[in-house]
Regions:
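Bacterial signal peptide processing site
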Residues: 19-22
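Intrinsically disordered, low-complexity Pro/Gly/Ser/Thr-rich segments with frequent PxxP/GP/PP motifs
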Residues: 73-105, 200-241
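Short, solvent-exposed loop/linker segments at the N-terminal edge
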Residues: 38-48, 162-171
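Surface-exposed beta-loop interaction hotspot
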Residues: 121-212
Length: 287
């Protein structure tokens, strides 16, 4: 077992006689046999552009990656990762990256991420349209570009304080969503706020116990004044793992329509203090 070199990579790529690449030069080559690369995202990365590039090294040689670039039609720029990472033969490693800003002018059907790997000895592996088995690209592109469209028309955010109604096992948290128009042209329809793995609508006379979203039914344009929307919240579950294992329980999907277009989903902006207050309300109700 050895380290995969530029010359051995090139031999794999063209199946021809090879000689070592000169010191200090780079050799661009195909992905070696047994090595696969794909884009992914862990649950705790959903809040932003953080992602992983998964390298599965099924070859007989170690890979030493000293640089990684992500670019492509899905993005407006290129991101660079210049930390060295070894991927031993027969192993898989996830390399964390911060993806570039989304290219909102690119159609969803044309989204592509390209990955370039720089190896320790100067070899360069370029992968066009890297595999995206969990649909990271359309999810991030849709969310980020929806935020751009919403921000053009209004500032939509959760307020920093949470009001509590009732006490003990009857506690209900009341979250206020504030909507402040920017005065710029456009129409924003706030359709609904969806529940999370941790939080759901509080049942009442008009809300069944199995409700999975809060209907908002608000429209905002340049002539609108500021609006406030209250949503009443209770825990989705009270088992011991609900809070201990939570990573996305306060990330509410907000469904909107921009300028009469199709429904789109973004995450409701939520101050850290508000997220903490909501989790405290869960502790109070669950005991």
């Amino acid at each position: 077992m050895g380290v995969l070199s530029a010359s051995s990579l090139l031999c794999i790529a063209i199946l021809a006689g090879c000689s070592p690449a000169p010191d200090g030069t780079s050799t661009t080559t195909a992905v070696p046999t047994g090595v696969s690369v794909q884009l992914g995202q862990n649950r705790d990365q959903y809040a932003g552009r953080s992602a992983i590039v998964r390298i599965e090294n099924g070859s007989e040689d170690d890979l030493v990656i000293v640089g990684l670039e992500v670019s492509g039609s899905a993005f407006t720029a290129t991101t660079d990762r210049d930390r060295a990472s070894a991927v031993p033969a027969g192993q898989t490693k996830d390399l964390s990256v911060e993806l570039p800003p989304a290219a909102c002018g690119t159609a969803a059907s044309d989204l592509r991420a390209d990955v370039t790997l720089h190896l320790e000895d100067g070899a360069v592996i370029a992968i066009t349209a890297v595999a995206d088995p969990t649909a990271v690209l359309p999810r991030l592109h849709g969310a980020e570009c929806t935020v751009v469209g919403v921000d053009r028309i209004a500032d939509v955010t959760a307020e920093s304080s949470v009001r509590l109604e009732g006490s003990g096992p009857s506690t209900v948290a009341v979250l206020t969503i504030s909507v402040t128009p920017t005065g710029r042209r456009g129409r924003l329809d706030l359709v609904e706020l969806r529940s999370t793995v941790l939080l759901k609508p509080a049942p009442d006379a008009s809300t069944p116990t199995d409700a999975s979203a809060w209907p908002l039914d608000r429209t905002v344009d340049a002539t609108s004044g500021p609006k406030s929307i209250d949503v009443r919240i209770v825990p989705t579950r009270c088992d011991p793992h609900a809070l201990a294992e939570d990573k996305v329980g306060t990330r509410f999907p907000l469904v909107v329509r921009i300028d009469g277009g199709p429904e789109a989903v973004m995450t409701l902006p939520l101050p850290a203090a508000t997220a903490t207050a909501l989790k405290d309300a869960v502790r109070i109700r669950c005991g």
